[in-house]
Amino acid sequence: MAAVSCSDDVETVKLEGVTLAPTTVSMLPAETTQLTLTVQPENADYDAILWTSDNEAVATVDEAGLVTAVAAGTANIRVEVKEFSALCAVTVFAGNKLADNAQVGDFYLADGSLLDRETDAATITSANAIGIVFTTDVTRMGEAEKEALRAKSVEPHGLVIATRTPRQVTDLFYWYMTPDYDSSRDESEIGLPKLWDNFEEGEGKEHETYALVNNDLEGYKYNMAIRTERKADFEAGYYGAIKAAADFEIEVPAPAASTGWYLPSAGQWFDVLRNLAGVELSDTESSFFLIDDYGNFSWMNKGRVNDILNECMAHVADNMKTPYASLGNQDQYWTWSTVSDDQARIIMFDNASFVYSWWYRKYFQWSVRTVLGF
């Protein structure tokens, strides 16, 4: 007869590992996020769970895995169970909203977060504001920049214009000029269109030309074409305005989740004035008129455009902005938009109520103000 043995011992299940979800999280100050711990196997035996933050000035965690964002920066949240551990990387942004909730007029910060346009003045002044959102209409973004953002796993949200201009040796830049003063080059060889309907005949087709300029949204694409297809001459400084826009990255680094700074197109400048200054720019209103038979047109009765733009960034710290009309009553900015081998378009506006879309020879020197996609 076999012996029967009775025991009160219960077999323990050995812990084999732990995981955390999510493993990365982006937060705004005062937000909370619950982390979920999973043990393997799920019926493993363990006595205690230890949660810690390596930077409690940025984010704290309680005994249940609830993370609270404190201030801008990064922190690693660690959970330890016996000899096993797992991490969650936390990024806390400086703003009070993220790109998903962007609105025209919001302040774009150096870390890629935003301050709502209604944020109090003191907070805006103390923040590292580098730009202002001028459109959240992704149909007014160039296809190339949307592709560039998606390649970074960033869904396109809109466009930002810089609050300050490049502060290099000069505030003014030519569009293209070689050391021997040659300012003519056919950029259609590398895909840049010429934005003047019927240029060769010198006929004033203002509505057709307006349509070309208004729908010119591929600033990023054509900046990249110059930077890559004309690389040697670009790096040598022949493309003054486009290189100034690229070099602005050194002065004001763009967030990783953006396209980086570039020289805007004429159509993008139209959207800046429409959305930030409240200016209607169409070819059907009574104030639209052709300046001459060479593709130049303008509008009048648009109010104090410079003052309105300055009001948009009134609370940005002085060292982070360049006021409009800082060189006088009128602003003149280069766009990437070529007209012919030796001409490119500029945008001009002033406090006398005029907005101009003109072309100038590429050896003229005008200002540069950059944009980026986010």
Residue ranges and their predicted role:
Residues 39, 259-260, 266-270:
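Extracellular/lumenal glycan-associated surfaces
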Residues 56-60, 132-136, 334:
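Exposed, tryptophan/tyrosine-rich binding patches on extracellular proteins
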Residues 66-68, 257-263:
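A glycine-rich, coil/turn loop motif that links secondary-structure elements
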Residues 9, 266-374:
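C-terminal, surface-exposed recognition/capping segments
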Residues 7-9, 93-258, 359-374:
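Short, compositionally biased
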Residues 7-96:
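Extracytoplasmic soluble-region selector
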Residues 2-5:
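C-terminal motif of bacterial Sec signal peptides marking the signal peptidase cleavage site
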